Regions:
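Alpha-helical interface subdomain recognition
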Residues: 1-92
Length: 92
């Protein structure tokens, strides 16, 4: 939820922020990076849903939940770092 919120705010900022007369979001490298981050968030969300399904079905899910926990921490740091970069001086 936190990574998704950060990314949504950054996308809105990139739409509003103009660089050399064009929105920051018009830059292809920005689009690719934001798409990659959104893809990773969605992949982690699906892994979490998979863990919940396993837990509800009373299946062993220790390995999957450990993977999700590790990936979540890394992804939040990665998204926060990229969002900070896109916000530039306003990120602080």
């Amino acid at each position: 939820a936190g990574a998704q919120a950060m990314l949504e705010r950054t996308v809105q900022y990139a739409r509003d922020r103009s660089v050399f007369g064009k929105p920051l979001l018009a830059k292809q490298d920005v689009q690719f990076t934001l798409a990659e981050l959104q893809t990773e968030i969605e992949l982690l969300r699906q892994l979490n849903y998979h863990c919940v399904r396993m837990y509800v079905a009373q299946e062993e899910c220790t390995r999957e939940t450990s993977m999700a926990k590790l990936a979540a921490g890394r992804l939040v740091r990665k998204v926060a770092d990229w969002c900070l970069q896109f916000h530039g001086g306003y990120g602080y």
